[in-house]
Swiss-Prot record:
Pfam families: Prismane. It is found in: Cytoplasm. It is an enzyme of class 1 (oxidoreductase). Its EC number is 1.7.99.1. This is Hydroxylamine reductase. Gene3D superfamilies: 1.20.1270.20, 3.40.50.2030. The gene is hcp. Its main location: cytoplasm. It comes from Clostridium botulinum (strain Loch Maree / Type A3). Hybrid [4Fe-2O-2S] cluster binds at H266, E290, C334, C425, C453, C478, E513, K515.
Length: 570
């Protein structure tokens, strides 16, 4: 069976990648990632039970989160580390099973497929012996890559035959992947929430349960949105408690003459460690793509060698990384196949990986040693200037709420007629130029609220301001879409409205990968309707599932700039 992947917006032909991923992943990588998800589901079966009887599940919790994150689009292309993850997962699964048995669980080793119902309350249907059949995901084991390959052939997306059940299972899984990404960053800063892990396990097990109806899976998808809000709130707390609340900041997009390191991705802990270790070395630090919002945090502003932001969204990295001249640290997605001309300057860390590039692992105390990349930078030329000037950002919820009187007055007087939430992701497709044109053509009495790398389609345009309020308010990274929700809820309260949809806010969101999926589900949980997704609707939505979203939530897509602006403004 050939590979099949349709988790990102660029799925081939709007249907799915079957030969090689548009992202660059090979068939082997795609299938290994399918197997990782299957192993994670097996672990979830046991960790759910272990949690119920009070056993420590921290190792499994961490593995589930990291594994889901490692399969996000453009995160990891390293076959060796992905296969090692499968092997590690099988060991964790066995360890959990042994711990449950030791704690009093009953396991029929001869039949190798039944546990007593006392310890399998989340599995299957009771048989006439008051036992439940255990899923293959819980019992499958192997110890070599060849067996991994054979198993991977049988556990991919298309293993679920019913199109609608498959669609809902994948929608739920992709929401969990996005949730895992945000939880990983919070965990790295010492913040966690057991209820989020418990839901993730419950949802993973549910994707194995053939007795669940489409309605039951739909309810789980919406529940996923609730935990999406929770995880974004947790990460917001982690980031702001550690580094302060983002504040209005002018960010330099030019360069200096010192050698530099470019840091990309989302992990602020890595950002902090890199700034500390480069201080006094003569090496400058620049952010790239989704790391741009690090410039807004007060804690990072004390570093004089933190220059600003270099370049644009992730998909332009082939050209921009070449021009940067120095080494690049990829802390998370998005990494694309590097050119030979700069591949030796790429370093990965965390769950990110690419075959043939250097990976920086943490030591036993959790800290990372960036000395190799720092010494590498010293041997490199300074960055080539590709832009100059400044961009402004830092409009997360705390900053915007500080401006609330000014914003509310502008709405009441009619100076601001409507807000447009244009959060989300950027990507390669030329049709995404729609978002640049949309921003340009919006009436001058409108304000764009953004988060994520979608901002690069318009954050360098001169769109002016309204009574001193910039017409593009950048809250931060994709997870800072949480800030946009907080702002909307506060405005609802200020204007004494019953329904969040009564606000003069329209949602025109560009999506790309699975973090955008959890943001969407979170917005649906908060009651937001009439969200428009583009440049295309997800390939993983079957016609019937798409119909549910359209009929119940008013989900739509984009058409032309003129038609859409007219529709939104009416």
């Amino acid at each position: 069976m050939s590979m099949f992947c349709y988790q990102c917006q660029e799925a081939a032909g709007g249907r799915g990648c079957t030969v090689k991923g548009v992202c660059g992943k090979t068939e082997d990588i795609a299938k290994t990632q399918d197997l990782i998800i299957y192993v994670v589901k097996g672990i979830a079966i046991y960790s759910s039970q272990a949690r119920e009887i009070g056993l420590n599940t921290s190792e499994a919790d961490k593995f589930i989160v990291e594994s889901l994150f490692s399969t996000i689009t453009n995160a990891n292309f390293d076959a060796k580390t992905l296969n090692a993850r499968v092997q590690e997962g099988l060991k964790i699964k066995q360890s959990l099973k042994d711990a449950i048995i030791k704690a009093g669980g009953s396991y029929n080793s001869k039949e190798n497929k039944s546990w007593t119902s006392k310890f399998l309350s989340v599995l299957g249907i009771k048989n006439d012996k008051d036992e439940k059949e255990i899923h293959d995901a819980a019992v499958w084991a192997a110890n070599n890559p060849e067996d991994f390959k054979k198993k991977a052939e049988t556990v991919g997306v298309l293993a679920t035959e019913n199109e609608d059940i498959r669609s809902l299972r994948e929608l739920l899984t992709y929401g969990l992947k996005g949730m895992a990404a945000y939880l990983e960053h919070a965990n790295n800063l010492g913040y966690d929430e057991d209820s989020i892990h418990a839901f993730m396990e419950k949802a993973l097990v549910a994707t194995l349960d053939d007795t669940l109806s489409a309605d039951e899976l739909t309810a789980l998808v919406l529940e996923c949105g609730k935990y999406g809000v929770d995880v974004m709130a947790l990460l917001d707390k982690a980031n702001t408690s550690t580094y302060g609340n983002p504040e209005i900041t002018k960010v330099n997009i030019g360069v200096r003459n010192n050698p530099g390191i470019l840091i990309s991705g989302h992990d602020l802990k890595d950002m902090e460690e890199l700034l500390k270790q480069t201080e006094g070395t003569g090496v400058d630090v620049y952010t790239h793509s989704e790391m741009l919002p690090a410039n807004y945090y007060p804690a990072f502003k004390k570093y004089k060698h933190f220059v600003g932001n270099y370049g644009n969204a992730w998909w332009k990295q082939n050209e921009e990384f070449e021009d940067f001249n120095g080494p690049i640290l990829m802390t998370t997605n998005c990494i694309v196949t590097p050119k030979a001309s700069y591949k030796d300057r790429i370093y990965t860390t965390g769950v990110t990986g690419f075959e043939g590039v250097k990976h920086i692992n943490p030591s036993k105390d959790g800290k990372k040693d960036f000395s190799e990349i720092i010494e590498h930078a010293k041997r490199c030329a300074s960055p080539k200037e590709i832009e100059k000037g400044e961009i402004i950002g830092g409009f997360a919820h705390n900053q915007v709420l500080a401006l609330a009187p000014q914003v509310v007055d502008a709405v009441k007087t009619g100076a601001i007629k409507r807000f447009f939430v244009m959060a989300g992701c950027d990507g390669r497709m030329k049709s995404r130029n729609y978002y640049t044109d949309f921003a340009k053509e919006l009436p001058k009495d409108t304000v764009i609220l953004t988060a994520g790398c979608a901002k690069y389609k318009y954050n360098k345009l001169d769109l002016g301001d309204i009574n001193g309020i910039p017409r593009v308010l950048d809250a931060g990274q994709c997870n800072d879409s949480y800030s946009l929700a907080v702002i909307a809820l506060k405005l609802k309260e200020v204007f004494e409205l019953e329904d969040i949809n009564e606000l003069p806010i329209s949602y025109n969101i560009a999506w790309y990968e699975q973090k955008a999926v959890i943001v969407l589900l979170a917005l649906l949980h908060l009651g937001v309707k009439n969200i428009h997704l583009g440049p295309t609707l997800p390939a993983f939505l079957s016609p019937n599932v798409a119909k549910i979203l359209v009929e119940n939530f008013g989900i739509g897509t984009i058409s032309s700039v003129d038609e859409d602006i007219k529709m939104f403004m009416n």
